[in-house]
Amino acid sequence: MPIITLPDGSQRQFENAVSVMDVAADIGPGLAKACIAGRVNGELVDACELIEQDSQLAIITAKDDEGLEIIRHSCAHLLGHAIKQLWPQTKMAIGPVIENGFYYDVDLDHSLTQEDLETLEKRMLELAKTDYDVIKKRVTWAQARETFVARGEDYKVAILDENISQDAHPALYHHQEYIDMCRGPHVPNMRFCHHFKLQKIAGAYWRGNSDNKMLQRIYGTAWADKKQLKAYLERLEEAAKRDHRKIGKQLDLYHMQEEAPGMAFWHNDGWTIFRELETFVRCKLKEYDYQEVKGPFMMDRVLWEKTGHWENYKENMFTTSSENREYCIKPMNCPGHVQIFKQGLRSYRDLPLRMAEFGSCHRNEPSGALHGLMRVRGFTQDDAHIFCTEEQILSEVNNCIKLIYDVYSTFGFEKIVVKLSTRPEKRIGEDALWDIAETDLAKALTDNNIEFEYQPGEGAFYGPKIEFTLYDCLDRAWQCGTVQLDFSLPGRLGASYVAENNERKVPVMLHRAVLGSLERFIGILTEEYAGFFPTWLAPQQVVVMNITDGQADYVQKLVKELQDAGIRAKADLRNEKIGFKIREHTLRRVPYMLVCGDKEVESGKVAVRTRRGKDLGSIDVNDFKEKLLQEIRSRSLHQLEE
């Protein structure tokens, strides 16, 4: 007679073992219809799962995050069902859930086309709209293997042979004549899987190993209802318009080429943005009392062996040899900063020591993972390392948090999700030190009125960390900022200071990043602003145009005056119609276009127009200059009269 306790604390008693769906039906027919799965004593299970003992139960519906994930997983099975009907010789590999959707890797004897994708999606919808029940059956390992051998599903057989114990009882999910194997849970009926869209096809090696066969990966998205799907597809459409690669080309910011994969060739306007960003961060470093240093970008492999990077990270490191010595091009700045700390005798009076660098780093990312500025091999990292005592951890973390929020607010990012990762099972350092560190990190967040969630066991082996994830205007997540405590590296590399009692002690080190990679952050900003960079960051801030040759001298004089004031201004004296010039510079997202005709020359004014098409009328040159300088100096996100 199991007693079921629901999330609101109410209880229901049943005579015999009862399924999740039975409990939902007992509560009400509406909930039974909406029931996708259940969470029994914290574990996600299928709606058909029997509960035999007293248990805590939460009914999962499409309104829950878990419910949506299950819908997506079941859509992957639906894809398998449809593709086997269309091309029966297809061999199914794996079909997991990913962010916003799912994919399935398939082995097919022909290359899928866009037309095939449309045919496949149509068949999926036809099948889903029959609202068939999904039947789950537990079988022995041998029965599962026999099933997939008979069906010619070589990849499923390989999964059983290599990944599943022969003592296990795998779950087989029956979609009419189609059978798939999965840990589940899955939807009980395909009425939950009507709102999906197949998106693209890519190549993927079986097991992610380039020595294995290349499979075709079919990506799709799935949502709980039509409205959610429509909104997501609209966001994708908007994201495509904002793609930094497309805008980067339109605005002539940078380019990539095959001879230097994952490394940007910065053009003048793109490099202007880069340098402005660097200058801004540099001002903040001075404000928050950091030293700026510069370490070599290449160091002997021996040093990387001492740090542990060679053992754990060598696949991602570029190397070169000279005079019988092997060198590693640095993937990160921290070992170099420890070397600087070690020069000379350090005292507790020198701490905290905040050391920042715009470090040129390189990581050997897989070529298939490279993506514009967002995923590169060569990048500039804005990280810093703070050497401090255990007693200074709290104040230093506080200082880091203030800096991070100070910077993010300048760019208009308001939604920031914060996570605190705590000690993993395998770690170094005494528990007492971990206690201090975790308590101080949490207190610093609380002191700054920052909501956060714990990620138990997700910290690095050498210390806990805080992660700051930005959400952009399309609600996409970008993990940029980190504050990571490190109890290991300074000791590994022999760093120490003289404590107040004249004993040698190893400093605590904080790794701190705000923007992360400057290249990636420029990519994020390009998409956030759709290329309409705030005036202070815009590569060209003002363009001054004449209507006829008679205003050329006035235009050149005005441009020089603006340039002398530190404003990035240029003249456009081409013999083109003024409407043509305005349109061209509007497409280039120049914040201000100044038009000079005879009337403006006579009055000492300029006709001001913004890139958004707003006509600000005739403004006195000095008034405009002062207002513009104020906008630039304050790093305002808004243009004049916005």
From Swiss-Prot:
Sorted UniProt keywords: Aminoacyl-tRNA synthetase, ATP-binding, Cytoplasm, Ligase, Metal-binding, Nucleotide-binding, Protein biosynthesis, RNA-binding, tRNA-binding, Zinc
GO-annotated biological processes: threonyl-tRNA aminoacylation
Gene Ontology MF terms in the entry: ATP binding; metal ion binding; threonine-tRNA ligase activity; tRNA binding
Domain TGS: 1-61
SUPFAM superfamilies in UniProt: Class II aaRS ABD-related, Class II aaRS and biotin synthetases, TGS-like, ThrRS/AlaRS common domain
InterPro entries membership: aa-tRNA-synt_IIb, aa-tRNA-synth_II, aa-tRNA-synth_II/BPL/LPL, Anticodon-bd, Anticodon-bd_dom_sf, Beta-grasp_dom_sf, TGS, TGS-like
Pfam families xrefs: HGTP_anticodon, TGS, tRNA-synt_2b, tRNA_SAD
Residue numbers spanned by region Catalytic: 243-534
CC cofactor note: Binds 1 zinc ion per subunit.
Reactions catalysed according to its record: tRNA(Thr) + L-threonine + ATP = L-threonyl-tRNA(Thr) + AMP + diphosphate + H(+)
GO annotation, cellular component aspect: cytosol
Record's subcellular location: Cytoplasm
Coiled-coil stretches noted in the UniProt entry, renumbered to this chain: none
Stored SMART domains: tRNA_SAD (SM00863)
Enzyme Commission designation: 6.1.1.3
Gene3D superfamilies: 3.10.20.30, 3.30.54.20, Anticodon-binding domain, Bira Bifunctional Protein, Domain 2, Threonyl-trna Synthetase, Chain A, domain 2
Enzyme class: ligase
Family named by the database record: Belongs to the class-II aminoacyl-tRNA synthetase family.
Functional summary from the UniProt entry: Catalyzes the attachment of threonine to tRNA(Thr) in a two-step reaction: L-threonine is first activated by ATP to form Thr-AMP and then transferred to the acceptor end of tRNA(Thr). Also edits incorrectly charged L-seryl-tRNA(Thr).
Protein name: Threonine--tRNA ligase
Gene from which this protein is expressed: thrS
